Amino acid sequence: MVDAFVGTWKLVDSKNFDDYMKSLGVGFATRQVASMTKPTTIIEKNGDTIILKTQSTFKNTEISFQLGKEFDETTADDRKVKSTVTLDGGKLVHVQKWDGQETTLVRELNDGKLILTLTHGSVVCTRTYEKEA
């Protein structure tokens, strides 16, 4: 099922991203720059390992993980988190935990688009990606 997510995805729409970053404690200047960028997400699979790369003019990040196994992650806004990614009902569910806080990043496919729903407390952000040829 993970195979359906494999590919290169370009951001085409974003809703409530600034509020989401604000809830995480991201500073004003960083939020301004991050809000303007249109990142590309590259999802690859190598055996049991999934590689998720995010590339933009703001910052490039890369994580490698196996489903259901906790790993250390440094986020684009430099949070040091414990992350776990699972496959749940056709959705990739990525949970980040740090300092007693938790945020959830859910990736799902809908009409050929990758929908990323970010949740931190009561703040929900939706980012839509289209697959590049």
Curated annotation (Swiss-Prot):
General function of this protein: FABPs are thought to play a role in the intracellular transport of long-chain fatty acids and their acyl-CoA esters. FABPs are important elements related to the hibernating state in mammals.
GN (gene name): FABP3
InterPro entries from the UniProt entry: Calycin (IPR012674), Fatty_acid-bd (IPR000463), ILBP (IPR031259), Lipocln_cytosolic_FA-bd_dom (IPR000566)
Keyword list, A-Z: Acetylation, Cytoplasm, Hibernation, Lipid-binding, Phosphoprotein, Transport
Broad class of the protein's primary localization: cytoplasm
A Gene Ontology BP annotation from the UniProt entry: hibernation
Residues that bear Phosphothreonine: 8, 30
Induction line: Up-regulated during hibernation in brown adipose tissue.
Keyword Nuclease found: no
UniProt xrefs under Pfam families: Lipocalin
Positions annotated to bind (9Z)-octadecenoate: 127-129
Modification sites for N-acetylvaline: 2
Annotated binding of hexadecanoate, by residue: 127-129
Source organism per UniProt: Ictidomys tridecemlineatus (Thirteen-lined ground squirrel)
Domain remark from Swiss-Prot or TrEMBL: Forms a beta-barrel structure that accommodates the hydrophobic ligand in its interior.
Phosphotyrosine: residues carrying this PTM: 20
Protein name from the UniProt record: Fatty acid-binding protein, heart
Recorded GO CC terms: cytoplasm
Post-translational modification Phosphoserine, affected residues: 23, 83
Binding site for octadecanoate: 127-129
One Gene Ontology molecular-function label: lipid binding
Family statement drawn from the similarity comment of this UniProt entry: Belongs to the calycin superfamily. Fatty-acid binding protein (FABP) family.
Places the protein is found: Cytoplasm
